[in-house]
């Protein structure tokens, strides 16, 4: 349903949002780390999981955000990516801000998204001294989201364009767990390193 809704969305890119690639990059990284990986629906029970990735989940059913918050509060690690929580199950936009229902848990709020041309790219530059210990610079393409940070830790920042210095990866301890927010379509190498450290 999320894929259908994305294909019907009018923007931010008129062609190919690269949703399947976003999911596949994370799946590949997790499998290469030896993690058993399930692809589940929004109705699925989350109690048996320690790590949950929510890649480009444009559509959030009513109540799904609360379920994700509870997962993190109870000790889970939640990884949310850009362009998530924009519409409900009837494809109506949430008006309270995005990612809907997760702004407090993630410690961020989406301001806008930049759709890059196919030949354009930006870079994700690590913050010195972040708890992840990532030191590489990574390429990001296609979609780059701009977020306002309320109380999240910034782990990486954009390297160029009008949003140079803005957050591209954030973290917030939430309850007994953790919430990470990935603001851009990152290259495969990023996910390999990131999931090796979370």
What are these regions (language model features)?
Residues 1-198:
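Carbohydrate-binding surfaces of carbohydrate-active enzymes
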């Amino acid at each position: 349903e999320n894929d259908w809704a994305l294909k019907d969305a009018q923007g931010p890119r008129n062609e190919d949002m690269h949703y399947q690639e976003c999911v596949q990059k994370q799946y590949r990284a997790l499998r290469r780390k030896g993690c058993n990986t399930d692809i589940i629906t929004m109705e699925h029970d989350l109690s048996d999981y320690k790590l949950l990735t929510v890649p480009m989940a444009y559509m959030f059913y009513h109540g799904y955000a609360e379920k994700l918050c509870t997962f993190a509060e109870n000790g889970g690690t939640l990884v949310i990516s850009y362009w998530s929580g924009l519409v409900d199950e009837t494809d109506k936009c949430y008006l309270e801000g995005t990612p809907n229902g997760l702004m407090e848990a993630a410690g961020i709020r989406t301001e806008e998204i930049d759709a890059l041309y196919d030949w354009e790219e930006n870079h994700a530059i690590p913050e010195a001294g972040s708890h992840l210990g990532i030191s590489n610079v990574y390429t990001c393409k296609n979609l780059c989201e701009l977020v306002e940070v309320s109380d999240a830790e910034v782990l990486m920042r954009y390297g160029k364009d009008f949003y140079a210095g803005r957050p591209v990866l954030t973290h917030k301890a939430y309850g007994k767990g953790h919430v990470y927010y990935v603001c851009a379509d990152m290259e495969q190498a990023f996910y390999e390193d990131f999931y090796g450290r979370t």
